[in-house]
């Protein structure tokens, strides 16, 4: 399973590099593309066909070849992802972890592949610290101030949990369904978005560890009002 994740991570990195190269080449010729990948994918054929005023035939061929690389990488990533999802379906631990909000086959399988049943960690905070999601603490007199997360430990899993947190933050209407809606609403009022994402990723990691070690599915206590 870890081998599949390593391959997928490498392919995703290669795809990101190809996309950035396409953007860079277009930008050098005054063609500005919106950040949304879907827009770039859909608009690229038109750019190549209609912007001959700034794109030479050679440059158009270079960009077209990069677009072909992008499509091939998409297909390979999809193939590896399908294989991971097939393995997850037959793994009880992965299925339990997937009951946690924001966590799907990729995160659950990466977590189980990395820590097994999770018993190597005494508590959820230890697992979160291993991921580098626990904020540094600084004391001034009688006050304890939370600083930035340490970013130590398993960078790949940390990145996945951060992605899960950001996806949840994009859908505030669903927050009450997750069982930590009140906490999330109040945290959103006082924390910078990046700090909030890290705090939520920390919480998700702890919940996932609890679900994994206690061999039970996540059951949200639905919040009726979080105003």
Mark where each language-model region is.
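Short helix-capping/linker segments at secondary-structure and domain boundaries
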Residues: 18-19, 77-80, 116-120, 166-175, ...
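Glycine-rich, often acidic, oxyanion-interacting loops/wings at catalytic, nucleic-acid
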Residues: 1-96, 225
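Phosphate-backbone recognition surface of nucleic-acid-processing proteins
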Residues: 96-99, 105-193, 227
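Amphipathic alpha-helical segments in well-ordered regions
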Residues: 25, 110, 160, 164, ...
